[in-house]
């Protein structure tokens, strides 16, 4: 119908690969665009779901020289290491202060140049701010629903460290288009279809929703 845009899926992208990228890859595309990752940056990604792992991939393709993924479960963190993460931090094993200290340790005491929040947990936001270096950039992409309020210290977490905070909301046609181009070129390297952990037939649709 009028106003609807359609992109033809290239023949060399298997349907499973496209579904694995889903809306997570275009969402991550928008986030990394906002993050403005540059060659040589250290990047932390909070969240190891489809958006977080896709953001990790795009950060590497944008030139990040150090990539740290914070999340759970270990299966997803293992995927992050296969993608090319330099280090992973399991939130089931370390508490918030320990996670911040670990990022500081891995970045030589500075903190990350850029942190991308893709966890969906409001508590991750002040934690991620403290993982980011002075005059660094913090991008929030995971807060797609109202999951509650957070407490932060605007003096120490934002003003004093001159932190730049950016948010992203939604995706447009261009993010889908560029995502398909990325998948066509790098799909055999990053294998988005690995993000699919189970498939359902149409008769199992209610079971899929319950799961």
Regions from the language model: what does each represent?
Residues 1-4:
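A short glycine-rich beta-alpha junction/loop motif
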Residues 63-65, 111, 189-194:
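A local structural motif
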Residues 34-39, 61, 78, 82-164:
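Glycine-rich cofactor phosphate-binding loops and adjacent beta1-alpha1 units
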Residues 136-137, 152-194:
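Rossmann-fold dehydrogenase core element
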Residues 6, 11-98:
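Mid-domain Rossmann-like dinucleotide-binding core that forms the NAD(H)/NADP(H) cofactor-binding site
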Residues 73, 144, 171:
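Residues in the short beta-alpha loop(s) of Rossmann-like NAD(P)-binding domains
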Residues 102, 126-130, 173, 177-211:
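C-terminal hydrophobic helical "lid"/dimerization subdomain
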């Amino acid at each position: 119908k009028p106003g609807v845009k359609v992109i033809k899926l290239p023949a060399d992208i298997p349907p499973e690969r496209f579904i694995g990228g889903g809306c997570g890859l275009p969402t991550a595309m928008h986030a990394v665009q906002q993050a403005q990752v540059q060659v040589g940056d250290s990047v932390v990604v909070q969240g190891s779901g489809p958006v977080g792992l896709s953001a990790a991939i795009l950060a590497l393709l944008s030139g990040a020289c150090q990539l740290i993924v914070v999340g759970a479960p270990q299966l997803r963190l293992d995927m992050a290491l296969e993608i090319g993460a330099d280090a992973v931090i399991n939130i089931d094993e370390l508490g918030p202060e320990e996670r911040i200290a670990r990022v500081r340790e891995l970045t030589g005491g500075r903190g990350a140049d850029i942190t991308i929040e893709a966890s969906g947990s409001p508590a991750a936001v002040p934690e991620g701010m403290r993982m980011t270096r002075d005059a660094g950039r913090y991008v929030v992409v995971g807060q797609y629903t109202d999951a509650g309020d957070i407490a932060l210290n605007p003096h120490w977490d934002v003003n004093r460290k001159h932190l730049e905070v950016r948010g992203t909301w939604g995706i447009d046609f261009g993010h889908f288009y560029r995502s398909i181009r990325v998948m066509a070129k790098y799909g055999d390297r990053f294998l988005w279809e690995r993000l699919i952990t189970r498939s359902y037939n149409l008769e199992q649709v209610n079971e899929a929703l319950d799961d």
